Amino acid sequence: MGQEKLYIEKELSWLSFNERVLQEAADKSNPLIERMRFLGIYSNNLDEFYKVRFAELKRRIIISEEQGSNSHSRHLLGKIQSRVLKADQEFDGLYNELLLEMARNQIFLINERQLSVNQQNWLRHYFKQYLRQHITPILINPDTDLVQFLKDDYTYLAVEIIRGDTIRYALLEIPSDKVPRFVNLPPEAPRRRKPMILLDNILRYCLDDIFKGFFDYDALNAYSMKMTRDAEYDLVHEMEASLMELMSSSLKQRLTAEPVRFVYQRDMPNALVEVLREKLTISRYDSIVPGGRYHNFKDFINFPNVGKANLVNKPLPRLRHIWFDKAQFRNGFDAIRERDVLLYYPYHTFEHVLELLRQASFDPSVLAIKINIYRVAKDSRIIDSMIHAAHNGKKVTVVVELQARFDEEANIHWAKRLTEAGVHVIFSAPGLKIHAKLFLISRKENGEVVRYAHIGTGNFNEKTARLYTDYSLLTADARITNEVRRVFNFIENPYRPVTFDYLMVSPQNSRRLLYEMVDREIANAQQGLPSGITLKLNNLVDKGLVDRLYAASSSGVPVNLLVRGMCSLIPNLEGISDNIRAISIVDRYLEHDRVYIFENGGDKKVYLSSADWMTRNIDYRIEVATPLLDPRLKQRVLDIIDILFSDTVKARYIDKELSNRYVPRGNRRKVRAQLAIYDYIKSLEQSE
């Protein structure tokens, strides 16, 4: 079998994941408004795909052509374009289907040609009061540099200003960052109808109000368009430049980076399309997509529910971990010192972590706090707690990852604010991102320093903790806390030798330990001992690790994979991966936690990790995986994994064809894993 047939291209696997998101929009068992929101998630994901993965492929093609190498990347480009086009056609059909379904529920998303006289008058007033101040046309002249002017991933209206045989062009930015994209209109009879209009169509209706008095014209025509830029940046190293200065400079570079995708309304006149292509320097390698009347469907993630409660998911109230509420504990430190605590979001509330850091900020016994931030919420209470701690005389160290893609600007802001408050802020070395999720609190107790650590799979972010599944381990176990302390020392001195006995730390020992653990399962299988590997990951694309899993399967080791996103491994290849089962789950929460389980001859090893099985996470980032040393917590994670693999509603097979076939239920009972996990955790908390 040729080597290329052993792996699925990661770009195609990623698109297959996004097609699973589109399946959720098509799933009639999902509430109507949630289906509309899944269209927004699909669109947002696709934007990121073009910014990152497509842009990277484009760079590879240009380099390979300059070197005269093979055309594999160009062939892959064609397959990507074909797959995206097919999915976009399905997207358009689903959108129209959902509009009809909303109308049946008395929700009407109307356009500028469907307005009543009363609504027309109301819209002109709305435009003058709320919208006009945000609208400034960009006139397209021979010397206009649109690459410089246009914002990444914003929708624009390209306007024809027609006077006799002369046509001038202008662009209008749709300011959805300043004015809501969805505007409720005054109801008409019957009163139960709830009309809405998109911001795009308000501008279309008010074109006269924008251009009248400045241009003579016979007609104005508007067509939507959007451009996506390459999200990469170069860190140009200068002796005197700090990393923060380099990142600030690089972000400005991203604002004018080359376009990689141009989407336009398919009935836009050819002459206008060509003007825009030329002005945006769209090359033959870029994605040029004729689309519908509307772009930036990512705003549909926040599609409002103006109808009945059953049009959205039934809320699942976040659960408190009852251990923290025990009467014998004066504070969170007492509870954690008594025993390790495991939180699983979004089923558990993130409030416990926020409260622990708040307590640490003023507790007289706390000496020092160290934490690393990768992506935090816009109004982060964690940042506030670190500032309060510094004001209260604690020694506070915050490791800020300035290279967190799409959060760089926010993190530069936080770094400046923390520094001004007297917090010791440190950054990763360029090219070595810190993706671990750690904090360490040092506390004076009975004359000794006791340390409390957090090791997690997700970010310290109040918002995403309501949407992403992630674990937080809170522990005072010195075997773990001492090694978390070493990780922070390694971050501050990345070139000083350091060793770990319990933690798996990238880039120090992760690859070696993972290889050793897979090889141990192979040896156990060959000796007739219990063997098995179970992995829950966002992405599995590192070829070295994929090959190790193939070797395990060939040796008779059962391998169970739950991979949300990219998976280069192909299950069920005869003689290679017969013993590998791979599924993916897409549901109301984004599956984000990473779990590694090794049978280990009957004494299971269970790790929670910040790292996916990607080369960058294993070799080029600081990542941390922790073993669960408490048998009670280990069993809890094993139970949750069992529930996930028993899903008969939202689980799909990962296969060579990228078919996204649902796992058949057969005669098994109906299990929707995320709802079952909620019930499982709720029962645990009630029995504590």
Curated annotation (Swiss-Prot):
UniProt-annotated catalytic positions: 435 (phosphohistidine intermediate)
HAMAP family: Polyphosphate_kinase
Reaction(s) catalysed (UniProt annotation): [phosphate](n) + ATP = [phosphate](n+1) + ADP
Cofactor(s) essential for the protein: Mg(2+)
Function: Catalyzes the reversible transfer of the terminal phosphate of ATP to form a long-chain polyphosphate (polyP).
Entry keyword annotation includes Protease: no
All copies of domain PLD phosphodiesterase, residue ranges: 430-464
One Pfam family here: PP_kinase_C_1
InterPro entries (UniProt xref): PLipase_D/transphosphatidylase (IPR001736), PP_kinase (IPR003414), PP_kinase_C_1 (IPR041108), PP_kinase_middle (IPR024953), PP_kinase_middle_dom_sf (IPR036830), PPK_C_dom2 (IPR025200), PPK_N_dom (IPR025198), PPK_N_dom_sf (IPR036832)
Protein's name in the database: Polyphosphate kinase
CC terms in the record's Gene Ontology section: polyphosphate kinase complex
Post-translational modification note: An intermediate of this reaction is the autophosphorylated ppk in which a phosphate is covalently linked to a histidine residue through a N-P bond.
Residues annotated as binding Mg(2+): 375, 405
Record-linked PROSITE patterns: PLD
Gene Ontology biological-process annotations: polyphosphate biosynthetic process
Entry EC number(s): 2.7.4.1
